[in-house]
Amino acid sequence: MARKTAAEAKETRQRIIDAALEVFVAQGVPDATLDQIARKAGVTRGAVYWHFNGKLEVLQAVLASRQHPLELDFTPDLGIERSWEAVVVAMLDAVHSPQSKQFSEILIYQGLDESGLIHNRMVQASDRFLQYIR
């Protein structure tokens, strides 16, 4: 079998991340399996392991690939009004975009994953936002 090009490997990796997002939403992070993710992505389990060392690393990639509205970069020179506007626009996007909805579901409903990744990410985002608006 011919080796994949870098572009094909990147595309496969992204398909796995997108599939993982759907599987994590449908099954919950703790109950999702790499087999389910591989099937959803249309790849072998070996392909998943070629790109990731395990489910935790897949979850990290899913989290790294998306941004929650409270994770926006807030800078003092932006001003409080513009910052709130950015949050509202991002929240509206999260409500209307299917992938953003799925990502938000993971962050909200799966926040107590065994690794603590999701919970820690949301706490950090909330803390940054609260520091900015004070």
From Swiss-Prot:
Domain HTH tetR-type: 10-70
Record key words, sorted: DNA-binding, Plasmid, Transcription, Transcription regulation
Induction: The ttgVW operon is induced by toluene and styrene, but not by the antibiotics carbenicillin, chloramphenicol, nalidixic acid, tetracycline or gentamicin.
DNA-binding region location: 33-52
Transcription in keyword set: yes
Pfam family, one: TetR_N
GO MF entry, a single one: transcription cis-regulatory region binding
Xref: InterPro entries: DNA-bd_HTH_TetR-type_CS, Homeodomain-like_sf, HTH-type_TetR-like_transc_reg, HTH_TetR
PANTHER family listed in its UniProt record: HTH-TYPE TRANSCRIPTIONAL REGULATOR ACRR, HTH-TYPE TRANSCRIPTIONAL REGULATOR RUTR
Task of the protein: Unknown, does not seem to be involved in regulation of the ttgGHI or ttgVW operons.
UniProt-recorded name of the protein: Uncharacterized HTH-type transcriptional regulator TtgW
Organism: Pseudomonas putida (strain DOT-T1E)
